[in-house]
């Protein structure tokens, strides 16, 4: 296998999909040497079968806003690979969503899910609809229209969606409710459901908690932990919130959080009370992070990301390609000892090279943020056996999975 040749061929066949090309390039460049030790792989064209999705669904979503106007959006579901289990991956509602982004996410999801050792394939879906600024009624009408097409392509043994950016408990609840209405079935077809109707304890916290459990395993290899360490966190959604919560629980200090408008820097640290305010601001009122700065009198930088601030650990938890090569150089120069990715592909290839050259601890999102899908897999298990585990049971299983993923990375990684 010649990685450059395979990538060029994919670019020719699937042009104008930069995020997908980037994700494939990152994987091919790291496995090329090992792959070529196995000529039997090429005989069955394994690499193309791994890179190209099994199927892609695209559809128009037509819905009515509160003013009675008809709106249209695009809906997608990428079913990438089901070699080891049903397709599994979130649904994203954001104006930036396109086929390239969803193909990259589904590709990454396939590897992430396999690392958990749970029987889950990889998939991803979503729409260019943004819940921001929409009423509950508008979100519900859109979701119901979205599900009128999606429901026929999913199922507990076929494809099990979950939440992602723009899709939280409210949206998953609307989707699951519409799915039940259309199918007349109560099955584990969605994860991230409300606790009252088949959801799992620890699922909302799982991606953030899992990232910190993975980080702790990395820090152990250097004989240290989170106590007294300062942390830069990007984002202020689900992943960032529970990343911050676990950092505080383990004795670390959170200095920053952000949203698409800018970031806050609180030198006194975002403590439990302040984090509760952010959770209420974001989850209940759908507010902006600058309101935190107005309330607590700390620094707010508009239109920027927090990577120029000085800290011990960086935890990118917002979105893809949010941390570039220059940001990485600044972090290294400021003495960062570890970077652990809570988001999917938040670091550009240039940034990753900077971290690797500097020999700091670096955890790629495929491994570090696998906690969310791990607990989704545990939710699927609980649904299938009609049992519900305690928070302590689920958390212990999550810790064990993240520890095993770290051990696999140490054993087989480069």
What is each residue range found by the language model?
Residues 94, 113-227:
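Glycine/serine-rich phosphate-binding loop and adjoining beta1-alpha1 elements at the start
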Residues 191-194, 199-310:
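Glycine-rich phosphate/diphosphate-binding loop of Rossmann-like nucleotide-binding domains
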Residues 301-311, 321-338:
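Rossmann-fold NAD(P) dinucleotide-binding segment
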Residues 104, 158-162, 186-190, 233, ...:
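General beta-strand structural signal in soluble alpha/beta enzymes
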Residues 2-23, 218, 317, 332-414:
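Adenosine-phosphate binding glycine-rich loop
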Residues 40-71:
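Structured beta-strand/loop patches that form or line metal/cofactor-binding pockets in enzymes
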Residues 59-124, 128:
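Phosphate-interaction motifs
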């Amino acid at each position: 296998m010649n990685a450059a040749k395979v990538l060029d061929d994919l670019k020719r066949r699937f042009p104008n999909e930069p995020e997908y090309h980037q994700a494939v390039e990152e994987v091919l460049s790291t496995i090329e040497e090992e792959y070529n030790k196995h000529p039997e792989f090429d005989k069955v064209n394994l690499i193309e079968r791994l890179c190209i999705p099994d199927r892609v669904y695209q559809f128009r979503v037509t819905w009515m806003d509160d003013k009675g106007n008809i709106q249209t959006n695009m809906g997608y579901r990428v079913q990438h690979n089901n070699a080891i289990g049903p397709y599994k991956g979130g649904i994203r509602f954001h104006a930036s969503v396109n086929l390239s982004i969803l193909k990259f996410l589904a590709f990454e999801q396939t590897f992430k899910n396999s690392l958990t050792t749970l029987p889950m394939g990889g998939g991803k879906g979503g729409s260019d609809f943004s819940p921001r600024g929409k009423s509950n009624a508008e979100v519900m009408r859109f979701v119901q229209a979205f599900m009128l097409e999606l429901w026929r392509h999913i199922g507990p043994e076929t494809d099990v969606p979950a939440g992602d950016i723009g899709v939280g408990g409210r949206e998953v609840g609307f989707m699951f409710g519409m799915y039940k209405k259309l199918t007349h079935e109560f099955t584990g077809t969605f994860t991230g459901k409300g606790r009252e109707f088949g959801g799992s304890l620890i699922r909302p916290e799982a991606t953030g908690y899992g990232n910190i459990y993975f980080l702790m395993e990395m820090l152990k290899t250097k004989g240290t932990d989170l106590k007294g360490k300062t942390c830069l966190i990007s984002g202020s959604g689900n992943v960032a919130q529970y990343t911050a919560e676990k950092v505080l629980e383990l004795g670390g200090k959170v200095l920053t959080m952000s949203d698409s408008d800018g970031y806050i820097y609180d030198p006194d640290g975002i403590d439990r009370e302040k984090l509760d305010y952010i959770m209420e601001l974001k989850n209940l009122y759908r507010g902006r992070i600058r309101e935190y700065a107005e309330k607590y009198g700390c620094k707010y930088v508009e239109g920027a990301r927090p990577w120029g601030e000085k800290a011990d650990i960086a935890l990118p938890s917002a979105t893809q390609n949010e941390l570039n090569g220059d940001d990485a150089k600044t972090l290294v120069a400021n003495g960062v000892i570890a970077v652990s990715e809570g988001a999917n592909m938040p670091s550009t290839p240039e940034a990753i090279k900077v971290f690797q050259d500097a020999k700091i601890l670096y955890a790629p999102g495929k491994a570090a943020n696998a906690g969310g899908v791990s607990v989704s897999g545990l939710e699927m298990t609980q649904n299938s056996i009609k049992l519900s585990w305690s928070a302590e049971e689920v958390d212990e299983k999550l810790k064990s999975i993240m520890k095993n993923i770290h051990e696999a990375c140490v054993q087989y990684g480069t």
